[in-house]
Amino acid sequence: MAATLAPPRAAERPGRPRGGHRLFAIVLLLAAALRVLVMLGYDTARLYWYDSFTYLDTAVHLRPQGAFHPAGYPWFLWALRPFESVELIAAAQHAMGLGTGVLIYVLLRRRSLPGWGAALAAAPVLFDPAFVRLEHAVLSDTLVIFLVTAALAVLMWRAEPSARAAAAAGLLLAFAGLTRTAAVPLIGLAALYVLLRRGWWRRAAAGAGALAVAGALPLLVYAGWYAQHHGRFALSGSDGVALWARTMTFADCSVIRPTREQAALCPNGVDLDAASEYVWDPRASLNRLPGDRFSHNDLARSFALRAIAAQPLDYLSEVVKDTSLAFTWEPVAHPARMAPSTTFPRGSWPLPEEHALVGKVRQEYDPDIRGMCSVEPYASILAAYPYPWFLHGTLFGVLLLLGGAGAAARPRPVLLPWSFAVFLLVAPVAALDFDHRYVLPAIPAACVAAALAVPPLLRLAYRVAGPGRTTLRV
């Protein structure tokens, strides 16, 4: 008996999706049920010291933070402040998580992928516990993921994005950058995509210009607001400290030859297991200087740039080594005090009441703020939820490889989401350190790129196999 395999049909030009959406409706319903179960399985949203409380405090007293946290996420929290409920924040973010899955699905259907393929590409965002747990926490990750995915969908909805679509994508990426500054360079990648994608050079320049202007204006306004409060035209005051911490895993001052002022930031014998630990450890050389660590941001940046210029291969080696932690078959703790997993834990997580900011936020944002506890019997059901780590780590590496192969074979539809995924994965590691949390924004773009890579790779395989039809014995 023989089955005939005809060449796959081209899927380059976006069009109306073929077939119904019944399968994805079932998938979305299951994903929503999982999130309802999470809301029942935990008695409140997860609050982390000190990130969550800094975000909530900034939402009450709107001002740009001088350190790691720009004000994009606090604006979202400010909009929900009248309800005085961190549980509502979690519910809204669960809705965003579902929305991200929907965006992936509709974009891929628009690109003529079958319903099962588009639903499969959306599945990691909808069912990976790492995403769902972040949605249930007062952290900025879910908002960043939603904004970046929305920008991708807007830019790729048509084969040649209009100037209006490009401007909308620029705004979305700007707000993503104001939520997490690592997303700011995506504006440049998107503008380059529009410039190369559109047919006539005048239309291409107009589209890229619209995206660049729409992306730059919110950043410039924010930088001016930041300057009013901190006397410096910038988006944050922590970039130098972060990059200095990155260099502490390889810096050799006998090679770097720092200036007398920079020499105070040389490694002092403290050996920590992750670059990010040097930011907070009181024994690290930066933290032994007088004043607040972030008051030395410019000095830290100058040292870090000098170190990278003197030891570029050591720097690249550390970035590659830490980035590879994203693809492991089993979870690797980094730093050792953090235990990554794709499970829903049971237990209680009390708040550090010794910090005055906890009581201040409770008084000003939500009087019912408390440490999160699991609730039975729902927590036991969640604890039994099966999602092996390799579907989170190793599969992500496979998706990136598939997207990279597709970008090489047919770059037009695949290159933008693949470049977004690679940048979102590598940039945080290059700027500070690897964190399992920071991998998540790259996964939706990687799913889109991998899904779009399949048709051109199948066509390439068919051409290599030979013209006409291929007969397979089954």
Protein language model features and the residues they cover:
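Membrane-interface transmembrane helices that cradle and orient dolichyl/undecaprenyl
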Residues: 111, 151-166, 195-198
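Start-transfer (signal-anchor) and selected internal transmembrane alpha helices
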Residues: 1-36, 207, 456-457, 461-474
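Multi-pass, polyprenyl lipid-linked donor-dependent membrane glycosyltransferases
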Residues: 50, 89-99, 120-155, 162-164, ...
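Extracytoplasmic catalytic/substrate-binding loops of multi-pass membrane glycan-assembly enzymes
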Residues: 41-56, 64-87, 235, 296, ...
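Transmembrane signal-anchor helices characteristic of membrane glycosylation enzymes that use polyprenol
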Residues: 20-46, 127, 214-225
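Membrane-proximal stem/loop segments at transmembrane-domain junctions that anchor or position
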Residues: 235-364
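Membrane-interface anchor segments at the N-terminal boundary of transmembrane helices
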Residues: 18-21, 87-88, 317-418
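Transmembrane alpha-helices of multi-pass, membrane-embedded glycan-processing enzymes
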Residues: 77-84, 89-103, 144-147, 390-400, ...
